[in-house]
Amino acid sequence: MYTRRARRWVSGAIAAVAVVALAACSKGGSTSTSPDSSASAAAVPQAVTDLIAKYSGPSTFPPPGPPIDVTPLKGKKIFDIPSVPNPFVQSISASMKEAAEKAGMTYTKFDNQAQVSQWVQGINQAIASKQDIIVLNGAPDPRALGPQLQAAKAAGIPVIVMHFHDNDMPAVPSCEGCTDITATVTAPFNEAGKAAAAWMIKDSGGTANVLIVGGSDILPSPGTIKAMQDEFAANCSGCSNTVINIPVADWNTKTQGVVQSALQANPKVNYVYVLYDAMVAGAIPAVQTLAKTGQVKIASYNGSPFALDAIRQSNGDLVAMNVGEDTPGIGYATMDQVFRVLLGQQPVAERTPIRIWDKTNVAEAGTPAKAGVGYGNAYTSGFLKLWGLGGGA
C-alpha cells in the first residue's frame, strides 16, 4: 500500500544521495551490541521521557545571533543550487526564495537532476552571471566541486554549504570539504538519532531490539549511529542493537533484501531504524513479506511526506515513527547565514529544528502530509523579527 508511492519518491532521491556521497568504497557489514544476559527491562528513565517531550511538539526559536538590518542587501543576487528535486529540498528552496524576496534580493534557483556535472554547470553559471552568493542546498557534495569552489572564491563569491555537515562537526575551514567555502548551515543528524533512540526505548518499555540500517558512505552517518548507541547504552540496559550498512548506490535495489535477511537472521528484532527516509521504501516490503507487521516497527529520519503518510495509514503498526525536519525553518536559517555573510559579519552557528512524529501527532503534518507542515511558525516569524521585517513576538 505504501511501497509504490514511496518508491516513486526514492527513485529521484537515490540518485541525488549517491552522488552526494563520493565514490562509495565501504562495503555492507554489520556490528551488534547486546545487553547483559542478566539485564531485565527497567523503568524508562525520566531523561528519555523528557527528551521525547522536548521534540514532540512545534519548534521554539533560539536566535542564532544579534538582530541585523537587511536593508543594504536590496538588489543583491543569490544563486540556489539544490541537490535533488524532491519535496524536502523544494520546500527549503521555496522558503529561501520567500525570505530573499522579503529582503529585496533577487533569487535564482538552478534546477537539476542531481548530477555532479550539473552542479558544476550551476557554479559556473553563477560565476558568469556575477551572483553575490551561492548556496549548495541539500547539499551538493563540496568535496566533488573543488575546482569550481576555488573559482567562485577567486571571483569573490561566497559559498554556503547547507544540510551536509552535522551540528557537532568542526566549523569552516576545518570541516570536511570546507577549504574554499565561506560558511555552513549544519543539520541535527546526531540529535535526531538520539531522539529516535529515546522514542524506541520508551515505546518498547526498555526492551527495544533495534536493527539500525546505515549508509556509512554518507558523511554524518557514523556519528548518528554512535549517538543512537550512546543513548541506548546510557538509558536502556534491556535494549540491544545491530548495525548493518547498505551503500547509497544500493538503497533502491538492495534495502528490501538486506533488511529481510537481517530480520530472518535475528527474529528478536522489533524495530528497524533506517537512517534516511529513502530506505523506508525497501524496509516496508521486507517487514510485510515476513508477515511481521505489528511485530516489527519501522522508524526513520527526514520527515518526508510519504513516510509520515505511512505512519498515519498503518496507525503506527508498520511505519511507527519519524524524526522530521522543519523545512521552512531550514530555509530561513540558511537565509540568515546568507544575510550575515553578505553584510560582512562573521557566520553564526545556525541550528534547525526537529520533531518526533508518531501516530499520536502525525495528523498535524496534514492529510496527506506536506513538507514543513506541523512545526509551527516560530522560526519564520522569529527570523523576520530578527531581520527587522516583521514577525511575531
Label the model's feature ranges.
Residues V20-A24:
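C-terminal motif of bacterial Sec signal peptides marking the signal peptidase cleavage site
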Residues C25-P35:
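Bacterial lipoprotein signal-peptidase II cleavage site
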Residues G65, W119, T182-N209, G223, ...:
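Hydrophobic alpha-helical segments within soluble ligand-binding/sensing domains
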Residues F79, K130-A139, P158-H163, L211-I212, ...:
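Periplasmic-binding protein-like
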